[in-house]
């Protein structure tokens, strides 16, 4: 036990070096010898190396440097520049209990089942082995080592901008409010001029089921391998469910991507209110967000940024085996969701949402959507997508999908397709992969909706409003948001569609197959088979059937108008 002051304590064997009375280095010696020490240091900037065994280390307020097991600390001009835990086998370590008081603490718990608790301050904690580097007292790097070693750590840090790399094992991490950076398994953090430059998980095949409870603030979480449980408080959080990498320039995010895409688990991620960014990664994940403008990738992918704003979101799995059946529940707000492959369920509350049911890409300029396009069009499965009130955009993708939208002017493509926007107005909507797709059920709410159902015997129902519907494949062109042309494409592909449009001035092209078309009151324009409509200043000027030899027996019932 030491009193008030800045004490240096080695619990077992060790060596401390000085030059001209200034400390230059400190290290454990005889690392396979020692005992279970109890070390208490009262207030001050203390340096403690527990050494061999399971030690109990307690400090009062101050900026403490603590190594739970064996290790070394190097100094320049009396300031620590490198702290490293260096046990290469669990036998020389122990289950340490570390309680650090308020302050900016540096803690390397080492191997075995450790418990680390800190009070308020900007703490840096490594749950297992690793290294911290500093320049002039400012953190430059934190990295895991001996990544295959480690065990079940419990880490709880107080309020502040904390940094935690939990390491190997099924760890539990809890942080108070603040802008925290947490890696659930092994990883590396690089800092330039005190700002985070790179965060990356390492050892993608290593790790376990972590429970990460991160408090209020703008947090960064890379959960790592395993079926992790991640919960974040209010704030704009960035979360990768499995392995990944995030890059920054001058503290501003530039790139976020999945790594080790064939490794991971079925994660459960909950982010409370804020503009959150979440990449679920490998497996069938459950992702839940509260109100805010969220960006969510259900599987593996990447997001690119310019000046801190997302300009490209892309899901990039090229095989179903690296994905899973995700369940995504997004709160009210203007959400961007790329569900990825497999049988996904997507539900959103009110807002102008953009949802891709399978793989694809979204592009933005100054925060405004410029394009949405499907990719890996032959892949995908049965998605269920339900979006709330608002002007929503949905490209459901491959498979027998069910799409339901609330009231608003929605744009829905039942299978694969591409949407292009100019000055925030729709310029072109086109289905793609005409021979691909399945029987979709599209229930579109009240509003002036645009629907291209795609391949298959689709069931389309639209609410009150002036809707534009193509039963099979097609393309619609606009100038400054005003329609100029509508035509069937892939005219030898499609199915026997059932299209019901409630009251309004609806435009419907049934396309290939034997279609059933029903409208309510309104001035409707209907082509039972393939065809083209041309417009001038938004007014229909010509209607022409095409590929008449490919038609079939349609049933058309129209209401008053």
Residue map of PLM features:
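Acidic, glycine-rich low-complexity segments
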Residues: 1-561
């Amino acid at each position: 036990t030491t009193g008030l002051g800045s004490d240096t304590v080695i619990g077992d064997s060790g060596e401390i070096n000085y030059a001209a009375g200034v400390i230059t280095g400190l290290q454990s010696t005889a690392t396979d010898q020692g005992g279970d020490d109890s070390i208490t240091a009262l207030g001050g900037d203390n340096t403690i190396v527990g050494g061999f065994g399971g030690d109990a280390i307690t400090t009062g307020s101050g900026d403490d440097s603590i190594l739970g097991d064996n290790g070394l600390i190097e100094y320049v001009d009396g300031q620590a520049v490198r702290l490293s835990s260096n046990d290469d086998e669990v036998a020389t370590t122990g289950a340490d209990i570390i309680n650090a008081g308020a302050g900016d603490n540096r803690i390397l718990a080492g191997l075995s089942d450790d418990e680390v608790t800190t009070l308020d301050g900007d703490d840096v904690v490594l749950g297992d082995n690793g290294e911290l580097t500093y320049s002039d007292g400012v953190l430059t790097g934190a990295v895991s080592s001996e990544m295959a070693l480690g065990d079940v750590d419990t880490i709880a840090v107080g309020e502040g901008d904390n940094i935690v790399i939990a390491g190997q094992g099924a760890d539990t991490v809890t942080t108070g409010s603040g802008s925290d950076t947490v890696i659930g398994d092994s990883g590396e953090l690089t800092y330039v001029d005190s700002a985070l430059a790179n965060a990356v998980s390492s050892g993608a095949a290593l790790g376990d089921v972590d429970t990460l409870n991160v408090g209020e603030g703008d947090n960064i979480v890379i959960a790592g391998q395993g079926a992790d449980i991640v919960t974040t408080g209010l704030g704009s959080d960035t979360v990768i469910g499995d392995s990944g990498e995030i890059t920054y320039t001058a503290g501003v995010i530039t790139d976020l991507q999945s790594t080790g895409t064939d490794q991971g688990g079925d994660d459960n991620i909950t982010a409370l209110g804020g503009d959150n960014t979440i990449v679920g990664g490998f497996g069938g994940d459950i992702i839940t967000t509260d109100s805010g403008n969220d960006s969510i990738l259900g599987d593996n992918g990447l997001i690119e940024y310019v000046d801190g704003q997302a300009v490209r979101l892309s899901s990039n799995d090229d095989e179903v085996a690296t994905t899973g059946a995700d369940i995504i529940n997004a709160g009210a707000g203007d959400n961007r969701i790329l569900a990825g492959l497999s049988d996904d369920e997507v539900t959103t509350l009110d807002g102008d949402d953009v949802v891709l049911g399978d793989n694809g890409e979204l592009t933005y300029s100054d925060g405004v959507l410029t394009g949405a396009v499907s990719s890996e069009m032959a892949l995908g499965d049965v998605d269920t997508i339900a979006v709330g009130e608002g002007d929503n955009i949905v490209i459901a993708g491959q498979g027998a999908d069910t799409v339901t939208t609330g009231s608003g002017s929605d744009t829905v493509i039942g299978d694969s397709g591409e949407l292009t926007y100019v000055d925030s107005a729709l310029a072109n909507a086109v289905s793609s992969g005409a021979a691909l797709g399945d029987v979709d059920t599209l229930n579109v709410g009240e509003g002036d909706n645009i629907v291209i159902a795609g391949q298959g015997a689709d069931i389309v129902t639209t609410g009150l409003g002036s809707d534009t519907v193509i039963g099979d494949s097609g393309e619609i062109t606009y100038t400054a948001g005003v329609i100029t042309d509508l035509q069937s494409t892939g005219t030898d592909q499609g199915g026997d569609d059932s299209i019901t449009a409630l009251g309004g001035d609806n435009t419907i092209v049934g396309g290939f197959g034997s279609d059933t078309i029903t409208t309510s009151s309104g001035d409707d324009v209907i082509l039972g088979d393939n065809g083209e409509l041309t417009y001038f200043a938004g007014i229909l000027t010509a209607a022409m059937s095409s590929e008449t030899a490919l038609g079939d027996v349609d049933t058309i019932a129209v209401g008053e108008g």
